[in-house]
C-alpha cells in the first residue's frame, strides 16, 4: 500500500506528464528546484502547504484539486467526480 507521500508523488508526476512538462519546467513554473520536485514525485518528501500551493499554480490547478485527488486515492480520481471515487464518511 502506498503512503500519502508516494500517492502525492504519483499525482504530481501524473499531472505533470499530462501537461507535457518535464520536472525542470514544473520546477520553474512553481518556483522550486528540480531536485525538490524529483524528491516529491518519488515519495521521499511530503510538501508543506506552501509547496502544495506552488505546485498547484505550476500545474494550473488548485490545492483543493490536488488534495481531493490524494484523499480519493490518487490515480486521477477526484472526490465526487462522477462517482469514480468519494472520500470516506467520517
Question: What are these model-derived regions, one by one?
Answer:
Residues 10-29, 89:
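Short basic helix-loop element that most often maps to the first helix and adjoining turn
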Residues 57, 67-90:
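Short, charged recognition helix plus adjacent turn
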Residues 12, 26-27, 37-40, 66:
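Conserved hydrophobic/aromatic packing and binding residues within compact polymer-binding modules
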Residues 1-7, 77:
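A detector for short, charged/polar N-terminal pre-domain segments
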Residues 12, 23, 34, 49-52:
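Helix-turn-helix DNA-binding elements, focusing on the entry/boundary residues of the two helices
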Residues 31-45:
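Recognition helix of helix-turn-helix/homeodomain-like DNA-binding domains
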Residues 50-65:
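DNA major-groove recognition helix of helix-turn-helix/homeodomain DNA-binding modules
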Amino acid at each position: 500500500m502506498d503512503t500519502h507521500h508516494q500517492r502525492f508523488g504519483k499525482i504530481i508526476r501524473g499531472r505533470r506528464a499530462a501537461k507535457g512538462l518535464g520536472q525542470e519546467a514544473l520546477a520553474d513554473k512553481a518556483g522550486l528546484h528540480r531536485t525538490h520536485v524529483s524528491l516529491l514525485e518519488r515519495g521521499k518528501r511530503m510538501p508543506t502547504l506552501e509547496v502544495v500551493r506552488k505546485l498547484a499554480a505550476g500545474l494550473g490547478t488548485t490545492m483543493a484539486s490536488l488534495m481531493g485527488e490524494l484523499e480519493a486515492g490518487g490515480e486521477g480520481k477526484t472526490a465526487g467526480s462522477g462517482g469514480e471515487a468519494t472520500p470516506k464518511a467520517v
